[in-house]
UniProtKB/Swiss-Prot annotation:
Residue stretches in coiled coil: none
Family that this chain belongs to: Belongs to the MscL family.
Subcellular location: Cell membrane
Signal sequence coordinates: none
Protein name: Large-conductance mechanosensitive channel
Keywords: Cell membrane, Ion channel, Ion transport, Membrane, Transmembrane, Transmembrane helix, Transport
Membrane topology (UniProt): Multi-pass membrane protein
Keyword Membrane appears in the UniProt entry: yes
Residue stretches spanning the membrane: 14-34, 81-101
Function: Channel that opens in response to stretch forces in the membrane lipid bilayer. May participate in the regulation of osmotic pressure changes within the cell.
MF terms in GO: mechanosensitive monoatomic ion channel activity
Taxonomic lineage of the native organism: Bacteria, Bacillati, Bacillota, Clostridia, Eubacteriales
CC annotations in GO: plasma membrane
Length: 150
């Protein structure tokens, strides 16, 4: 069982997947930092010095000066500012992944269709080698060699 697991884990696809997950997690942290620390502060400044991470709806009915105070008091809140940051974060990651996949697909070479290796016997309709001059099933002589007889 250990040998089978080792063979499975050492296949190229599993290792590629693990590397992709690690790089994806690191990329996600970079995008989150970009959104929270670089993108949202200027947008908040343009919208009247709004800190999006501090936008919330207090459901308890009491007044709190900040989201941190409401959370510390255990008040139920809807953190829509944090949610907006998460949406922007997701959009940036989705666009980046779309652009990468689009480039990879563009750079992939179009695979050429393989030449046929079999043909159909015109007499018994069996599938035979394309190079056959006589059908191994009905023993009919085939005059057309090298191309399908379908």
């Amino acid at each position: 069982m250990w040998k089978e697991f080792r063979e499975f884990a050492m296949r190229g696809n599993v290792i590629d997947l693990a590397i992709g997950i690690i790089i994806g997690a690191a990329f996600g942290k970079i995008v989150t930092s970009f959104v929270n620390d670089i993108l949202m502060p200027p947008i908040g400044l343009l919208l009247g010095k709004v800190d999006f991470t501090n936008l919330y709806i207090n459901l308890s009915g009491k007044n709190y000066s900040s989201l941190a105070d409401a959370t510390a008091a255990g008040a139920p809140v809807i953190k829509y500012g944090v949610f907006l940051n998460s949406i922007i974060d997701f959009i940036i990651v989705a666009v980046a992944i779309f652009l990468v996949v689009k480039q990879i697909n563009r750079l992939k070479k179009q695979e050429v269709a393989a030449a046929p290796t079999t043909k159909e016997c015109r007499y018994c309709k069996s599938e035979i080698s394309i190079a056959a001059t006589r059908c191994p099933f009905c023993t009919s002589e085939l005059l057309d060699t090298g191309r399908p007889l379908k």
